[in-house]
Amino acid sequence: MGKSHGYRSRTRYMFQRDFRKHGAVHLSTYLKVYKVGDIVDIKANGSIQKGMPHKFYQGKTGVVYNVTKSSVGVIINKMVGNRYLEKRLNLRVEHIKHSKCRQEFLERVKANAAKRAEAKAQGVAVQLKRQPAQPRESRIVSTEGNVPQTLAPVPYETFI
């Protein structure tokens, strides 16, 4: 017997709700504001079938290009063969959430602006580039009252 290749085939676990997260959708989902240019993550909500994306787009990140009263238009770059195609999806707000991929960058921009303003007030140059973790500083261990000890492994014995 042939295998079925329906629109939602092989999504038994992909679209199921999380453990103890069943039931009605929280109102905060509908109160989030999406603007054109926002970066969003696609995560389908299995309890809302309307405006649900195809299984391929689960977990993908895209950019909002259109906003209507109940749905959001998202642009996704899909790899087809050896090229990327721009796909435009119209999804309901239950199936998307704001991406945290730029969160660290935006926090760093604010921190750098504060550092720059403080340095300008003091009239000093400031280093804003991130530095990799440096080696630890050297240490000196005193042997005064702390005689080095030689350690040796204890021989393994079996008692039967």
Curated annotation (Swiss-Prot):
One of its GO terms (molecular function) is structural constituent of ribosome. It holds the Pfam family Ribosomal_L21e. One of its GO terms (biological process) is cytoplasmic translation. Keywords: Cytoplasm, Isopeptide bond, Ribonucleoprotein, Ribosomal protein, Ubl conjugation. It is found in: Cytoplasm. There is a cross-link at residue 32 (Glycyl lysine isopeptide (Lys-Gly) (interchain with G-Cter in ubiquitin)). Belongs to the eukaryotic ribosomal protein eL21 family. Component of the large ribosomal subunit (LSU). Mature yeast ribosomes consist of a small (40S) and a large (60S) subunit. The 40S small subunit contains 1 molecule of ribosomal RNA (18S rRNA) and 33 different proteins (encoded by 57 genes). The large 60S subunit contains 3 rRNA molecules (25S, 5.8S and 5S rRNA) and 46 different proteins (encoded by 81 genes). There are 2 genes for eL21 in yeast. Component of the ribosome, a large ribonucleoprotein complex responsible for the synthesis of proteins in the cell. The small ribosomal subunit (SSU) binds messenger RNAs (mRNAs) and translates the encoded message by selecting cognate aminoacyl-transfer RNA (tRNA) molecules. The large subunit (LSU) contains the ribosomal catalytic site termed the peptidyl transferase center (PTC), which catalyzes the formation of peptide bonds, thereby polymerizing the amino acids delivered by tRNAs into a polypeptide chain. This is Large ribosomal subunit protein eL21A.
